[in-house]
Amino acid sequence: MSFNHQEIEKKWQGYWEENKTFRTPDETEKPKFYALDMFPYPSGAGLHVGHPEGYTATDILSRMKRMQGYNVLHPMGWDAFGLPAEQYALDTGNSPAEFTEHNINTFRNQIKSLGFSYDWDREVNTTDPNYYKWTQWIFLKLFEKGLAYVDEVPVNWCPALGTVLANEEIIDGKSERGGHPVERRPMRQWMLKITAYGDRLLEDLDELDWPESLKDMQRNWIGRSEGAEVHFNIDGTDEKFTVFTTRPDTLFGATYCVLAPEHALVAEITTAEQKEAVEAYINAVKMKSDLERTELAKEKTGVFTGAYAVNPVNGEKLPIWIADYVLATYGTGAVMAVPAHDERDYEFASVFNLPMKEVVKGGDITKEVYTGDGAHVNSAFLDGLNKEEAIAKMIEWLEATSAGNQKVTYRLRDWLFSRQRYWGEPIPVIHWEDGTMTAVKEEELPLVLPKTENIRPSGTGESPLANIDEWVNVVDPETGKKGRRETNTMPQWAGSCWYYLRYIDPNNSEALVDPEKVKQWLPVDIYIGGAEHAVLHLLYARFWHKVLYDIGVVPTKEPFQQLFNQGMILGENNEKMSKSKGNVVNPDDIVASHGADTLRLYEMFMGPLDASIAWSENGLDGARRFLDRVWRLFVQDNGELSEKITDAPNKELEKAYHQTVKKVTEDYAELRFNTAISQMMVFINDAYKAETLPREYVEGFVKMIAPVAPHIGEELWSKLGYNETITYASWPTFDESKLVEDEVEIVVQVMGKVRAKLTMSKDASKEEMEQLALEAIQDQIEGKTVRKVVVVPGKLVNVVAN
């Protein structure tokens, strides 16, 4: 007989809710464990089977840690601002707040149906004014520290959506959402000075228990490089521009310069003959995203401006070009080109037939670029020096002649923080008619997002908030000065930068988080989520955390001690699940047909947690069959406990049980859930063969399966006679001495070739091993003379016979 999952799951979910089984007390003598999930964006589509994979992993850890005597913080909430809700509101005329609330309720019910042990009293929602009051408070702190500033920035403007898009929201020059054309235009934007924290964001990665591949992604994104700035005068004018280079030693090899098409000097220096070509090129570039412009594989394009720069080191005149591979937002927006010794410059020079000049020996620049080290040539005072010596000497020369200076730059850009949308946190700043701006006073927070029927983009580049006169227009009560509120809102990243802190103290109206509580819970012990957030979300959260550390709000330098990215669950055809492909699996259907415990077990058993694996109905059925086998082993058809369960010990199961406790405990801790489940399957097979089942082993097994399949775990626990939940029962322990193998497998070789394998006592003497081995290979050595027998105790016997 199999168990009735619908009945059991409903029963125990009701019990947990009623008894607040997973409430986390703040005051406790127990050691702490903080297990964090990347909270979801509550979309209209609801939960998909990819969500529970990470959630089940943290839930297994949380449930085991509670049984091991830890005070566990395991919360859930909603990252609920953002573009999709606003787009839905635009498409349907409904309010994004109602849409969001409806979606959250759906998500919450779906998540509860999967039996996760969240403390729902700590639920947070980024769109709740009591929450975003503190998001705004953090913004005020950034503003006070000079880390939030306004700048004119070329942005990705999408006329159809009426908003600015991040590079990540653009695919092939069109918006990811809706496929609308995108163009570049300068706009007044709020920026956060994340570059001020570049070194710390880089250095502190070393202290974290994160996958090395993920640390490398962050290192590359920050992209620290050391080099020099060099100033170039423009021939025949008073103008100059600055380039950053990691190879100042190759300055003698510069043969042309390239400016970004958006560079401020372009219009000024372009000659009349080149004006038309330059303007046409600039218009074409406006349609491209930064990502497309800097792709290594693409064909190089560019236009000559007609102007020349003067090389400070030798007075040579270098033609100035514009090209889209140089970005105004990266470095200084200008480069000196040394085609003999730089890949991209070489490609560009080859396309436009520009001169090349060798200044480092070691290659043949008539055939290909040479980027290696070597003795410098054609470089006056650098001749004969290697790369490092030449860099140091050139920087010395640049600084002595005021032609440049040593410089460290980052690939990391300051964070474009404003969005021209309605559905986001209002930025708490007022712009006054006299040109000044002030922050909203702390005591006036939260600055609440006004309700409005019309959330269409204003079309001017401002957000829909610009249309709400009574909200936008303000008067200073003291001076009578008129002002306008900031109409930009914060990006969706803002609320997710610090949510892990609010879980610690979710209802505090006086402070972001209580200092004692935050000291108790930080850092987060494990953070599990998808790899798509490996760079931006984690970088932004680390940045805000460091600012909060500097102002004394948090006691740790880093927020997340250990981090793990789960893999992706693909459709049965090995493709990414998507509505358009019709291969999405809805967890609600599985919970109805197979049960939440089966879904949890299957997702953990599919393969390693970090692998991407295809969904399989057969695998799902197999997971259910295993749970049915467990049930039938312990429970009779009449619902009573199996008569095989006794208080007497059973020697034949002893080793298998202790092995299982050891392996499951270690594998859960190391997130190797698939191999832990395999071991439990082995134990169940052994238990079916056994005459009797010691009660101690049955209870231990139920405790081990409960974190994966908590409903069946609770039901079996109550059948074992316990009135209390299994949640806080103590985790089983194993005895090392019971794991020792009494017997070993010995390999028997003849002339170095394996001819037999024997099982014998691990303490067998050399003589016994030799005797047993010779008996086993009698037919192999018949008629031969045994010349020598080599015995390696506990391992092998090699017979030399001919």
Swiss-Prot record:
GO CC annotations?
cytosol
Per UniProt, what is one GO molecular function of this protein?
leucine-tRNA ligase activity
The UniProt similarity line reads: Belongs to the class-I aminoacyl-tRNA synthetase family.
The EC designation for this entry is: 6.1.1.4
Q: What subcellular locations does the record give? A: Cytoplasm
Q: Which reaction does it catalyse?
A: tRNA(Leu) + L-leucine + ATP = L-leucyl-tRNA(Leu) + AMP + diphosphate
Q: What sort of enzyme, by top EC class, is this?
A: ligase
The lineage is: Bacteria, Bacillati, Bacillota, Bacilli, Bacillales
Entry superkingdom = Bacteria
Going by the UniProt record, its keywords in alphabetical order are: Aminoacyl-tRNA synthetase, ATP-binding, Cytoplasm, Ligase, Nucleotide-binding, Protein biosynthesis
Q: Where is this motif: 'KMSKS' region?
A: 576-580
Q: What is this protein called?
A: Leucine--tRNA ligase
Where do the annotations place ATP binding?
K579
In the record, biological process GO terms are: leucyl-tRNA aminoacylation
Predominant location: cytoplasm
Its source organism is: Bacillus cereus (strain B4264)
